[in-house]
């Protein structure tokens, strides 16, 4: 195996390295980065691949364009990873070759058993034939046949032993040798015991009663079995086959030279027979090579499929970890299931039925979905926690962007770990505000304890943060318990969030709280016991009578400062304090991996006492330190909970209730940080090309190691064995059991031609067809020339029909050969009309029709030479029968065609031959001449077989005897067996391609889905940087920011019906319309940051590469302004479809310097900060309904771009004083907007009813001078929540929009009474006075 430094590399890249390396023996090519190939593979459909979907590196350099890949002027390699020795087809790796032989052994064993059964049947039939015909010395012929039958039975039994697996090659050789020595020589017209004597007159040899046709059929069968079944090396098979042919014809030559033929005719006869042997050897070699090519290629493809399956499991695990790190497991699983279903449906939509079928439209059109998918549920008894950093504005005043992001990342990382330990669910951050929930989305009985422990832990964590960072900040925490709506809003950059009036009340609890304490409501206090130090909240005494305090409506509140100490010290606290005394800084100071291991080992040896209910999370490690769960306990944990650590150093999580579920099976290299996941994903992407080019030079044996790893992975997999032993095809028809796969198989050749697929190996469908046509042409020419040569030997002119057939056939063969060469090498150079013709004839039925003609041309050419000489010349008759046997064997060619068609055609040819033997084609005078000639020739022959022959000479069929029927039957039986076996092999090869490609597509889909989720969390260009760095923060000199608020959504929202769920469904539709705008290419430079309640936040100019490509430095501002105008139009269109209510949009626009960065550890959030963001938020909050308000600096730039504004005047902006602002669009009278149109700053009622995270008014801040309130609006503008989910599908502009669909749908909806509203979606909206109209 590989050395430890390379094990990780080999683990992730073994598939591509071991399967895609070139087979050149003089060089080593290793592909480490498979992204480009996988991206191309991901575009393929489920079954829409050809049988040549190989990844081998071969071929020449093509021209640009899609057809350039097809420009390959040299022969491809035999198969992927093939050695350079074509005469011995093997892998270039010993490991792969041995594994291939081992994994293909079941198929080889099964085929050898079939061959033994066939040979035994032949021996039995020949034995019966000799026994039935009463002749002298029958035992001379029956004993060898019966003996070999016993040998076949013995070998058949031997195949079931373990010894056969080690010696099956030698067993095949022995079988063939015994068959050749015991059968074929005995059937020759001479024997070793009776040789010729030198006499003045040649003596007649001993006749064995077997004609030339019978013996030649045996020769053909031996050679076919040698090349196709015995599984010997090609060079050895060729040597044995040629030796056998020479011995066979030598024996026949010695007999013929002494009897019927004389002079030069014997040599012409020998030359003709040599041509026939050339044909059978050519066919055998072709079948041998293609069988080896498909067998090894199938092995490699199935191995790739297994490796891709392993990669698929790893990718799926990585994907789940990435998504679970940013949203609750139950929501993430639902989204992943939805994504998997969409991916599977996409695969089914692109399944490879024929192109004609793909164009068919269903008879029943599905009704389009009017509303977008809406994932939201109502959950009761949920505790909500809001926490704000007191003093954050002062702390960030003198910090750079990078330093500020680092501080927030450190602090929020601690909070993220606290969420995991206290079983809370982090929702988001709003500026320096952090909020989470407990009991949602999975209910918990101890939700209130979880939030209280979370709040106390945050206070302790920030104290430790101040000690380490030398800062002066504190935490103000508020908790409330009630009912929430949880789910996802929008289709782009969405996230898991919670909404309800209780959520807003929890935010109010935080605003009215006290730094260093947890401010809880009376509803939360009901779920707590007396373990905490609790005091009255005294809100009125602290803030006085104000609008903010009035929102409590007399709600009693409490302040919690910590737990009551019932005992001086408990064992749990002692252990915790000892760990805290050691110091987290000392843990971080471990300089090496050994020290880290020692530290971890020391922690494990510390005895962890059982946690008591009174122990809370008092000390929190920094975000980059991982400790055992036993070191941090919380009051919501069961005291008998098992604290065993999960693999990888992570503690198991509880999901439901108080008991911990079984630990999840995690990867050995799992991380808790999404930073590390992104970096891990980047490492899996591969090494750079420059490094991969140096790898072959530095590590010569890397391919051997990866091959060994490849073999180890597939060794224990049952798929390989089941694949070869139980192929997924019908045993009768040989069709695939999957109908879609069968249709794909039938169209694969045509699709390969249509898409100009590159030819890389002999297994390519088009190149395999070229070899088939070339072999057919060769056999046709040899048989035709031999038949014409035979006419010269008998001194008779060839028949005119033979000449006509030869001319027509040779034209067809040459035309087919030219077309095949065009398809393989020059397809991109043909004209459009020619290419359409090629695509037409490459279909399933046209290809079978043309293939049937081509494969039958040799037989047709031989039959065209059947004349009266067939009955008047016994040697001519024998030769023509032998030529027909070769034509029958030719039907083993064209393995891509149906074996049933080829075998039936071969059977027809055999039947026609027998009919011609027994039906006279000549007049009676010719028959009389035949009788006279045969009487003269046979009178001198004395043999046991013909000694009793009657005086009147019989027909050639009578002379040949019934053995021709048996010979043709046995040969046809072998052809049927080989055709079936080769088609199964060909289909298995195609299926291996399909499986490997399907797994590759799934893996790519698995990789794309996390990428899509990451893009919904953070922009793609930011994710790329996070793969190589631990943090991201960047300053932008001129970024554009907008805040768009639906100012009257609070008037529309009510919780009396389904808790307000249907109101948020309407909001989801409107936000979805905004997201659709961002899907347009024109707005690609705009990034959606987040949604805060009914406020939509977006920015532009954050991608520096896009800004550099722009012709104008402020071009992105114009794009953002156009987007804001489109948002106004979308709201107007949406209102036109609403009844009884019109939404009003208010937009604030500003540009300037800002900072973008990513904060968090387990849950990353992409956000923007800066004074520019604060002013953009103020432009919204003090803006005017249905208008866009901009600052003076932004006005100067936009006015130069042709936009007309109204000067509003000087307005007071919190934190900035008096500012000049401008409004768009311009009023008709060019006057200032009347005072009654000005929007008042949002009061706390708007905050509670409509938007989460709104800051208190300026008056409240003045009423509480002792409390340093952070401006939530500023923080809401300073920070952005990234959304984590799958991207919404882009819609074409020509398609009707959701608003138009809702409009059409609304025409059929009548207004009904709210009390009679049903469960239907339209009735629910009608109850809320939200309907659809024109």
From Swiss-Prot:
Residues 1272-1284, 1292-1303 have a biased composition (Basic and acidic residues). Detected in embryonic heart (at protein level). This is Adenylate cyclase type 9. It comes from the Eukaryota. The chain crosses the membrane at residues 114-134, 138-158, 168-187, 208-227, 234-250, 270-290, 769-789, 801-821, 850-870, 874-894, 903-923, 958-978. It catalyses: ATP = 3',5'-cyclic AMP + diphosphate. Keywords: ATP-binding, cAMP biosynthesis, Cell membrane, Glycoprotein, Lyase, Magnesium, Manganese, Membrane, Metal-binding, Nucleotide-binding, Phosphoprotein, Repeat, Transmembrane, Transmembrane helix. Adenylyl cyclase that catalyzes the formation of the signaling molecule cAMP in response to activation of G protein-coupled receptors. It comes from Gallus gallus. Insensitive to calcium/calmodulin, forskolin and somatostatin. Stimulated by beta-adrenergic receptor activation. Activity is down-regulated by calcium/calcineurin. ATP binds at residues 388-393, 430-432, 476, 1090, 1167-1169, 1174-1178, 1214. Residues 1-28, 49-71, 338-363, 635-670, 1266-1303 are annotated as: Disordered. GO terms for biological process: adenylate cyclase-activating adrenergic receptor signaling pathway; adenylate cyclase-activating G protein-coupled receptor signaling pathway; cAMP biosynthetic process; intracellular signal transduction. Mg(2+) 2 binds at residues 388-389, 432. It is found in: Cell membrane; Membrane. Residues 348-363 have a biased composition (Basic residues). Residues 57-69 have a biased composition (Gly residues). The gene is ADCY9. The protein contains two modules with six transmembrane helices each; both are required for catalytic activity. Isolated N-terminal or C-terminal guanylate cyclase domains have no catalytic activity, but when they are brought together, enzyme activity is restored. The active site is at the interface of the two domains. Both contribute substrate-binding residues, but the catalytic metal ions are bound exclusively via the N-terminal guanylate cyclase domain. Its EC number is 4.6.1.1. InterPro entries: A/G_cyclase, A/G_cyclase_CS, Nucleotide_cyclase. The keyword Manganese applies. Residues 135-137, 188-207, 251-269, 790-800, 871-873, 924-957 are extracellular. Binds 2 magnesium ions per subunit. Is also active with manganese (in vitro). Residues 16-28 have a biased composition (Polar residues). GO terms for molecular function: adenylate cyclase activity; ATP binding; metal ion binding. Residues 1-113, 159-167, 228-233, 291-768, 822-849, 895-902, 979-1334 are cytoplasmic.
């Amino acid at each position: 195996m590989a050395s430890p430094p390379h094990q990780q590399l080999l683990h992730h890249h073994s598939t591509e390295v071991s399967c895609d390396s070139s087979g050149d023996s003089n060089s080593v090519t290793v592909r480490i980065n498979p992204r480009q190939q996988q991206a191309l593979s991901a575009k393929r459909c489920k079954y829409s691949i050809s049988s040549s979907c190989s990844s081998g590196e071969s071929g020449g350099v093509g021209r640009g364009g899609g057809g350039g890949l097809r420009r390959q002027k040299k022969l491809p390699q035999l198969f992927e990873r093939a050695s350079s020795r074509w005469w011995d087809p093997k892998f270039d790796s010993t490991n792969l070759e041995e594994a291939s032989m081992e994994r293909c052994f079941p198929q080889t064993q099964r085929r050898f058993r079939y061959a033994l059964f066939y040979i035994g049947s032949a021996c039995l039939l020949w034995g019966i034939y000799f026994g039935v015909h009463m002749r002298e010395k029958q035992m001379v012929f029956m004993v060898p046949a019966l003996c070999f039958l016993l040998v076949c039975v013995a070998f058949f039994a031997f195949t079931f032993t373990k010894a056969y697996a080690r010696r099956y090659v030698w067993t095949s050789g022995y079988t063939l040798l015994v068959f050749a020595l015991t059968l074929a020589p005995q059937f020759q017209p001479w024997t070793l015991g009776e040789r010729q004597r030198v006499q003045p007159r040649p003596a007649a040899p001993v006749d064995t009663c077997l004609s030339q046709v019978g013996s030649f059929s045996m020769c053909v069968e031996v050679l076919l079995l040698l090349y196709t079944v015995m599984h010997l090396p090609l060079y050895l098979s060729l040597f044995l086959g040629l030796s056998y042919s020479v011995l066979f014809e030598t024996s026949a030559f010695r007999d013929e030279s002494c009897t019927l033929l004389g002079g030069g005719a014997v040599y012409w006869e020998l030359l003709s027979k040599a041509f026939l042997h050339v044909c059978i050897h050519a066919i055998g070699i072709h079948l041998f090579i293609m069988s080896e090519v498909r067998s090894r290629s199938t092995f490699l493809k199935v191995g790739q499929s297994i490796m891709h399956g392993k990669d698929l499991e790893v990718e799926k695990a990585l994907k789940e970890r990435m998504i679970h790190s940013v949203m609750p497991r139950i929501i993430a699983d639902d989204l992943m299931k939805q994504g998997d279903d969409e991916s599977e449906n996409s695969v089914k939509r692109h399944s490879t039925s024929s192109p004609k079928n793909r164009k068919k439209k269903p008879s029943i059109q599905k009704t389009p979905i009017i509303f977008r998918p809406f994932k939201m549920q109502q959950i009761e008894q949920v505790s909500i926690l809001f926490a704000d950093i007191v003093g954050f504005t002062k702390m960030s005043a003198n910090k750079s962007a990078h330093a500020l992001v680092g501080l927030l990342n450190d602090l929020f990382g601690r909070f993220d770990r606290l969420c995991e330990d206290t079983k809370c669910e982090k929702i988001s951050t709003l500026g320096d505000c952090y909020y989470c929930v407990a009991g949602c989305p999975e209910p918990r009985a101890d939700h209130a304890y979880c939030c209280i422990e979370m709040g106390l832990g945050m206070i302790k964590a920030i104290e430790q943060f101040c000690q380490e960072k030398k800062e002066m900040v504190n935490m103000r925490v508020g908790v409330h318990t009630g009912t929430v709506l949880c789910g996802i809003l929008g289709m782009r950059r969405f996230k898991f969030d919670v909404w309800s009036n209780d959520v807003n009340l929890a935010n109010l609890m935080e605003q009215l709280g006290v730094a260093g304490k947890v401010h809880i409501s009376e509803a939360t206090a009901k779920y707590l016991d007396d373990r905490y130090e609790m005091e009255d909240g005294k809100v009125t005494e602290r803030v006085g009578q104000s609008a903010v305090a009035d929102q409590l409506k007399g709600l009693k509140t409490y302040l919690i400062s910590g737990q009551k100490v019932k005992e001086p010290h408990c064992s749990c606290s002692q252990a915790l304090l000892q760990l805290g005394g050691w110091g987290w800084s000392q843990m971080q100071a471990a300089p090496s991996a050994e020290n880290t291991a020692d530290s971890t080992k020391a922690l494990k040896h510390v005895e962890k006492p059982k946690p008591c209910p009174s122990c809370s999370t008092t000390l929190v490690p920094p975000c980059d330190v991982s400790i055992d769960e036993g070191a941090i306990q919380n009051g919501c944990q069961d005291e008998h909970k098992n604290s065993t650590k999960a693999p990888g150093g992570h503690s198991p999580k509880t999901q439901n209730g108080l008991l911990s579920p079984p630990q999840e099976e995690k990867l050995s290299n799992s991380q808790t940080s999404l930073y590390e996941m992104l970096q891990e994903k980047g490492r899996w992407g591969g090494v750079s090309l420059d490094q991969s080019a140096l790898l072959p030079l530095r590590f010569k044996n890397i391919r051997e190691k990866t091959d060994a790893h490849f073999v180890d992975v597939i060794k224990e997999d049952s798929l390989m064995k089941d694949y070869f032993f139980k192929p997924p095809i019908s045993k009768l028809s040989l069709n695939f059991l999957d109908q879609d796969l069968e249709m794909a198989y039938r169209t694969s050749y045509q699709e390969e031609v249509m898409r100009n697929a590159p030819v890389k190996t002999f297994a390519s469908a088009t190149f395999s067809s070229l070899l088939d046509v070339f072999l057919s042409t060769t056999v046709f020419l040899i048989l035709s020339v031999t038949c014409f040569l035979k006419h010269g030997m008998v001194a008779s002119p060839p028949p005119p029909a033979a000449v006509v057939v030869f001319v027509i056939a040779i034209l067809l063969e040459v035309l087919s050969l030219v077309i095949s060469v065009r398809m393989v090498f020059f397809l991109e150079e043909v004209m459009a009309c020619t290419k359409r013709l090629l695509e037409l004839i490459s279909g399933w039925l046209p290809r079978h029709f043309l293939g049937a003609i081509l494969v039958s041309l040799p037989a047709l050419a031989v039959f065209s030479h059947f004349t009266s000489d067939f009955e008047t010349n016994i040697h001519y008759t024998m030769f023509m029968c032998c030529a027909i046997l070769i034509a029958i064997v030719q039907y083993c060619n064209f393995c891509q065609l149906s074996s049933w068609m080829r075998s039936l055609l071969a059977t027809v040819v055999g039947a026609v031959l027998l009919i011609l033997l027994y039906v006279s084609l000549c007049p009676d005078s010719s028959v009389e001449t035949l009788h006279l000639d045969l009487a003269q020739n046979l009178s001198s022959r004395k043999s046991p077989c013909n000694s009793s022959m009657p005086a009147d000479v019989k027909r050639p069929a009578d002379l040949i005897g019934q053995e021709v029927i048996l010979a043709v039957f046995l040969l046809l039986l072998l052809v049927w067996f080989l055709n079936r076996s080769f088609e199964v092999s060909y289909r298995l090869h195609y299926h291996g391609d399909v499986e490997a490609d399907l797994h590759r597509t799934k893996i790519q889909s698995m990789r794309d889905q996390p990428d899509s989720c990451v893009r919904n969390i953070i922009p793609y260009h930011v994710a790329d940087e996070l793969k190589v760095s631990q943090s991201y923060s960047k300053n932008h000199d001129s970024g554009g920011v907008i805040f768009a608020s639906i100012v009257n959504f609070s008037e529309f929202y009510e919780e009396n019906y389904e808790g307000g769920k249907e109101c948020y469904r309407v909001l989801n539709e409107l936000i979805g319309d905004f997201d659709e705008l961002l899907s347009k290419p024109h707005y690609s430079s705009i990034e959606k940051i987040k949604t805060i309640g009914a406020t939509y936040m977006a920015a532009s100019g954050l991608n520096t590469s896009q800004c550099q490509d722009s012709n104008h430095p402020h071009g992105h501002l114009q794009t953002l302004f156009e987007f804001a105008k489109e948002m106004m139009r979308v709201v107007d269109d949406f209102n036109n479809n609403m009844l009884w209510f019109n939404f009003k949009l208010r937009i604030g626009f500003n540009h300037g310097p800002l900072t973008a960065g990513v904060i968090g550890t387990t849950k990353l959030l992409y956000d923007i900060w800066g004074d520019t963001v604060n002013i953009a938020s103020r432009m919204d909050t003090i803006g005017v309904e249905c208008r866009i308000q901009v600052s003076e600096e932004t006005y100067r730039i936009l006015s130069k771009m042709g936009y007309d504004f109204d000067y509003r005047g000087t307005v007071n902006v919190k934190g900035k004083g008096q500012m000049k602002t401008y409004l768009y669009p311009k009023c008709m009278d060019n006057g200032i907007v009347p005072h009654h149109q000005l929007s008042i700053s949002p009061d706390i009622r708007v905050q509670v009813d409509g938007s989460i995270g709104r800051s208190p008014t300026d008056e409240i801040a003045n009423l509480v001078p002792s409390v340093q309130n952070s401006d939530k609006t500023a923080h809401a503008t300073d920070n952005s929540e990234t959304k984590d989910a799958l991207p919404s599908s882009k819609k074409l502009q020509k398609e009707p929009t959701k608003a138009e669909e809702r409009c059409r749908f609304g025409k059929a909806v009548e207004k009904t009474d709210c009390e009679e509203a049903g469960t239907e979606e339209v009735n629910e909206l009608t109850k809320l006075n939200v309907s659809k109209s024109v």
